């Protein structure tokens, strides 16, 4: 029983140290959670004339390793995303 508790605590500690699983929105429509990845330019999100978001990816973003900021379009400018 104690061994199971120890293993469970070990995995919980490893999960907390590595960070909780991150989510990203490949369609660039939701709030993208920040992670601690490199600052390589990964993609570009733009808003076209009819108001739809277009997301162009320049590199592969590993699942859970994609960061950016909340996509807000007050002046319809380009918003860069990083991975």
UniProtKB/Swiss-Prot annotation:
Propeptide part(s) removed at maturation, as residue ranges: 19-26
Free-text note regarding domains: The cysteine framework is XXII (C-C-C-C-C-C-C-C).
Keywords: Disulfide bond, Neurotoxin, Secreted, Signal, Toxin
Protein name (record): Conotoxin Im22.1
Any one GO cellular component localisation term in the record: extracellular region
Tissue localization of expression: Expressed by the venom duct.
Post-translational modification summary for this protein: Contain 4 disulfide bonds.
Molecular function via GO: toxin activity
Signal peptide feature range: 1-18
Keyword hit for Methyltransferase: no
Similarity comment: Belongs to the conotoxin E superfamily.
Main function: Probable neurotoxin.
Compartments (UniProt record): Secreted
């Amino acid at each position: 029983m104690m061994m199971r508790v120890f293993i469970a605590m070990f995995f919980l500690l490893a999960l907390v140290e590595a960070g909780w699983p991150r989510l990203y929105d490949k369609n660039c429509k939701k709030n993208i959670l920040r992670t601690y990845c490199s600052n390589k330019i990964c993609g570009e999100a733009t808003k076209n004339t009819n108001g739809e978001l277009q997301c162009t990816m320049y590199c592969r973003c590993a699942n859970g390793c994609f960061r950016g900021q909340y996509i807000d379009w007050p002046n319809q400018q380009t918003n860069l995303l990083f991975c």
